[in-house]
Structures are given as structure tokens and as C-alpha cells.
Amino acid sequence: MKKSVNERVKEAMKEQGVDLLLITPSSDMVYLLGKCMMSDERLNVYVVPAEGRDFLFVNDVYGQEVAGWGIPETEVVTWKDGENAVSLLLEQLEKKRLPYGKIGIGASMPAGFLVPLQEAFARTRFVLHREILGWMRRYKNEQEQSLMEEACSRCTEALKAVMKAGSGWIGKTEGAFADALCREMEQRGISEAGALVCAGAQAAVPHYTGKDGIISADACLLVDFGGKYRGYCSDMSRTFYFYGGCGENDKRREFEAVYGIVLAALEAGQGAAVLGGRMEDVDNAARRVIAEAGYGKYFTHRTGHGIGIDTHEEPCAASGDKSVIEPGLAFSVEPGIYLPGKFGIRIEDQIFMTVNGAKVLHDYPRNEWLVCG
């Protein structure tokens, strides 16, 4: 019989000598429970012992909500405002006779919780649970693959809808484009929709977040966008060049040449995503293409990152990541060249590794970069 996620987590905890996991509201809680309450200044944790019954330790404000989740075999323990939550949590562990010599926590646990916990649990060793939950989350099952495929398909259709306006976007702001794209995603059932839209020279800043830049003729537009479908992410980038109606010119010729290099790097990176290879192979392959074309110093970030419940997860397509490429991994391949004061180009697709190899989840044409109509 196939083991549940909870059973596999507890097995991994025992193997690594971890007594407890303390899971604060985060994507880790979503992964384990399929639910998550709002994160605020109150200590709310899902307590997972290696041996024994799990329980939710939450402020009374969230007690009714959490009880309504109906999580089997999971007790809900509440505390009230004005009480010392850390002391009460320690009391619960003692009462339930749960060991806490080594506790695993997530990298996103706020310092405002961790420091008081370390002070109260003076003899406890706190460790990141990356080798338990992080490792498990990198391998997606068929259902997770299906949800990511649907997220990617819906986001792709949203971009196609927005780009129907073609050169009608000239003179509009980055913010107007981003708002329209997010509306299209939301209309297609995408939650947490977001878009970075970078016009002209702003595209040379890899994670530019402005909204006031103007989309111009004879200039580029870099669009990095995505969202979630039923909890799973799409992350995609495309770069366009808006035709100014003046025939070919030096700006367009330079853009086209650099675009071809980035596209070749993308294809090389995707080609290196083979079962049995290493994640760093993807980065090396893409980076080699750009370096050999003379633009190595303008490719300033890793080639890709894992994707799942979070937009950025493990593993990474980066130098030094020697993770073996195996079925179930999902990650981006997104090489870029950023020329300060001129333009930037990034092309990003999402990949899922099946038993037969890499499957690209976005189908927006990569060669449709010139916007004329």
C-alpha cells in the first residue's frame, strides 16, 4: 500500500533523529494539511512528532476555523491572547510526553517566534527541516503535475488574450499591461496572479518592479508573470519588441541578435534536462551558449528554480546544484541577457520531468517576439 505523506514524513524524521516538526502558516502547512490559516504575530503551529499524534496549536482566534478543517486524527489545542504561547506549547509537549531534543523548523519561521522558542527550549537543537519536507516537496506526483499543467495552460491563454491588442499597447504604462494580464489570469481561475512588466531599458533590471514606464515603439517589453491554479504555480517569461513602423534599424537588429542567443541558451538548457543528469548541467549548458556569444557577464542569475506550491522551491538549475534529475521534478529554465541602459531579454518556460524525460508546460510561441499589428 502506498504510504501517506504524513507516514513518509515521520519515517524521514526518525532516520534523521528529528523529534518534532513545528510548522508555521506557510506552504509547508498547505503541503501537509491542504489548509493554512493566516500568518500574523500570534504563534500558530502544526506540531508533527516522529512518534505520537499530531496536533494544531493555535490562538483561540483561529480555533473555530481550524476545527472546521476536519483533519483526521489531529487534535486542536488553543491558547488565548495575553497568555504565554511558548510556555503553553512547552507544557503541551510535556503533558503529551513528546520528546523535543531536536526540532525541525522551516526557513520561513519568523525570528519573532524562533528566538523565544530557543530561549524557552534551552536544551533543544533547532534545525531546518529542508532534508525532510524540502526533499519530499521537490518530487511531484501525477496530480501535482496535472495542476501545474493546468496553471501553465491558463496563464499562457491569458497572455495570448492580452497580446491580441498588439501595437495598441504602445503609449500605455507597464502597470496597465500588468493589470490587464492579471485580470485575464483571474478570469481563467488563476489565484494570486502577478506580473512584472518591464518596458525598454527597465527590462535590463532582472526583477524590476515599477509600473509607470511607458511601452514604446522600437523598444522591448519583458513580461514575467504567473499565479496558482488550485494551489500550484505557473511561472513564465516572454520578451517582445514593438515595431515602430520605420523598417529595420540598429536597435531592432541588436535586439533580434541577442534574442536569438537567449533562445539558443533556453533550448540548450532544456536539452540538458535529461534523466540521470545533474541540475547544474542545465545551468552550465545555457550559460555556455551566452558566454560563447560574448555576453557572459550580462547573464546575472541562475538558469532556473524549482516550482510547485511556491514559485521558488528546490531544486535549482544553478552552478553547484548536483541534484540528480529524476521523474517528478518541476523547474524553470529562464536564461537572460541584460544590457544596462538598453534592454533586457529573458525567456522562461516551466518543465516537468516525466519517466520519459522533460515536458515543457508552456506553449506560448517563443519566436513570436516582434509585435507589429
Report residues per predicted region.
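Active-site neighborhoods and metal-handling regions in enzymes and metal-associated proteins
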Residues: 1-373
